[in-house]
């Protein structure tokens, strides 16, 4: 859709996977050892909850510099809304919306990696938790769903022929995914009073108690939802 644009932007310390392509995006060089370079990737700082305003300004400033330095060369911004390298680090709605606005202003698609976050916050999707419904172009899910899937906005759908049965999961795996998604959606797991938040609050309260007792040994943040 964005050809010949070929560059990608991601967050520092992100993890996107280990395949030949996405290992190029993962911000850890040891995962690329021995692999050929397939993508040109640039990075911006992830959200810093200790300095909200500065964090937004820095991210926007980095993006604007890249888009000025390499005009029309960026195809996508790949985002984890909650990072899982070295603990769980939770982003921020205002921060993400500012980034999405700059990307769309420069014709750069926003891809949300929900392989880790799908069905693990108080909403089905983490992008819904951060109220990014109108800002997202492509979403990837996996892990809890037992199968992987990519969801596109209408104007980002691949043309016929690009995706075939080669990439289709087995019928049993798809049935398992359907059962799990239905269970999470309809049996009290979601919402502020749902099972996922209840479990999180239980563990967070115990971790807070340990923090008070051993402040030099353990400290937050404690993640979000089932990501503790």
PLM region descriptions:
Residues 1-228:
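Conserved N-terminal phosphate-binding loop of PLP-dependent enzymes in the Aspartate aminotransferase
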């Amino acid at each position: 859709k964005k050809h010949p644009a070929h560059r990608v932007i991601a967050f520092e310390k992100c993890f996107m996977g280990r395949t030949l392509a996405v290992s190029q995006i993962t911000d850890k060089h040891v995962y690329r050892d021995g692999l050929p370079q397939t993508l040109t990737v640039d990075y911006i700082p992830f959200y810093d909850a200790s300095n909200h305003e500065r964090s937004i300004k820095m991210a926007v400033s980095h993006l604007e510099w890249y888009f000025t330095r390499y005009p029309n060369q960026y195809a996508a911004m790949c985002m984890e809304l909650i990072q899982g390298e070295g603990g769980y680090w939770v982003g921020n709605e205002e921060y993400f919306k500012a980034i999405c606005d700059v990307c769309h202003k420069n014709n750069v698609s926003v891809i949300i990696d929900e392989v880790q976050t799908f069905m693990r916050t108080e909403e089905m999707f983490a992008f819904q938790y951060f109220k990014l419904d109108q800002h997202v172009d492509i979403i990837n899910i996996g892990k809890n769903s037992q199968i992987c899937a990519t969801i596109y906005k209408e104007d980002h759908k691949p043309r016929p022929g690009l995706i075939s049965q080669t990439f289709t999961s087995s019928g049993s795996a798809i049935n398992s995914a359907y059962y799990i998604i239905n269970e999470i959606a309809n049996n009290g797991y979601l919402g502020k009073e749902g099972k996922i938040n209840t479990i999180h609050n239980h563990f967070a309260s115990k971790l807070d108690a340990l923090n008070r007792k051993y402040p030099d040994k353990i400290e937050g943040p404690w993640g979000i939802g089932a990501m503790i």
